[in-house]
Amino acid sequence: MLDILLTNIGQLLTMDQEDGVLRQEAMKTLPVIESGAVGIKDGVIMFVGTAEEAKGLQAREIIDCEGKVVSPGLVDPHTHLVFGGSRENEIALKLQGVPYLEILEQGGGILSTVNATKKASKEELVKKANFHLDRMLSFGVTTVEAKSGYGLDDETEWKQLEVVAQLQKEHPIDLVSTFLGAHAVPKEYKGKSKEFLQWMLDLLPAIKEKELAEFVDIFCETGVFSVEESKEFLLEAKELGFDVKIHADEIDPLGGAEAAAEIGAASADHLVGASDKGIEMLANSNTVATLLPGTTFYLNKESFARGRKMIDEGVAVALATDFNPGSCPTENIQLVMSIAMLKLKMTPEEVWNAVTVNSAYAINRGDVAGKIRVGRKADLVLWDAHHYAYVPYHYGVSHVNTVWKNGNLAYTRGDKAWSKATI
């Protein structure tokens, strides 16, 4: 006896093809069962097939999906979830053409968020991040990577990681924690980046002991941390047992993509300025390219990451929101899917694979998230759409009808009681 049987599914997107990251033709392929059904028991998927094949199955609850699309829960592999305050006051300055460095000198930019995060209590940060997670869930996301990075000191970075750990216990969404202490160089360490990185490295053994982070990340960019500094820092983190990621080539082609491939990073993120050589090296590596077109869009930049070229050359591409208060204040991964289709020239099939299978592998969750397969946990989304391409095509709104997390009802459109969180 099943707990739940979803039937009369118009298109069941299983995403279940080869194991491992998807590249080239595999990214263009979307496994779809027309007129499908999914059976769930004890939070686990027990049946995947056609509605006709499911006719003999017994279930405590049978849900008629009315010919709509069902997919795996989406995976957002790059967010800056935990932070204090907001920065809407900077919009007018940006529109007036005030340079970012001048905004920084006025106490704005990342320094504003760092100060607000330092001042906020752990309880305040939990409440705020919970609000944002609820929104992510409403957009169909069931697994999220969450970074620290708005402390730039030991106490606040630790506080952010503890917030993620608490939310992992309390919120339906699965969280994957990343230590991004090397997000920027604080004023007091100006010209002394190596000393600052050593301070951050000194925190890692305790973070590892308390299991507060699975990944270590660094911002490799002009004026922040060099390629050599980034490689050395991440290799030392790997020696301590962490997997690593890198904010790479967001603005300039510094060689961050090449560095990620060389050191075996789980992902290289941003990559707007990635060189041809960097793309080639990523294609010949196991590193996932996590592209963040929502950030480029919000910053009103003309040049987007070369997603089309990356896919054609064999890079495993994932998509993420880069949710953060400065350069991409949105939890809407569906909007990111639309931007990727229009600006990165990705097909609807590639976009879907990039927010499920490949995004799961970008955070070492490829064996548990991003696919609908017998034996896996039942993270499922019912969409108010009768064709999968409709979701990125009709942009700017949420098409989610219902979300199940581990087989439990986690969100239903129109249920005003589903979220008690406030910002």
UniProtKB/Swiss-Prot annotation:
Keywords tagged on the record: Cytoplasm, Histidine metabolism, Hydrolase, Iron, Metal-binding, Zinc
Cofactor: Zn(2+); Fe(3+)
GO cellular component, one term: cytoplasm
Pathway in which this enzyme or protein is active: Amino-acid degradation; L-histidine degradation into L-glutamate; N-formimidoyl-L-glutamate from L-histidine: step 3/3
Protein residues bound to Fe(3+): H78, H80, H247, D322
Binding annotation for 4-imidazolone-5-propanoate: R87, Y150, H183, E250, S327
Stated family: Belongs to the metallo-dependent hydrolases superfamily. HutI family.
Known role: Catalyzes the hydrolytic cleavage of the carbon-nitrogen bond in imidazolone-5-propanoate to yield N-formimidoyl-L-glutamate. It is the third step in the universal histidine degradation pathway.
Protein name per UniProt: Imidazolonepropionase
Organism: Bacillus cytotoxicus (strain DSM 22905 / CIP 110041 / 391-98 / NVH 391-98)
Gene designation: hutI
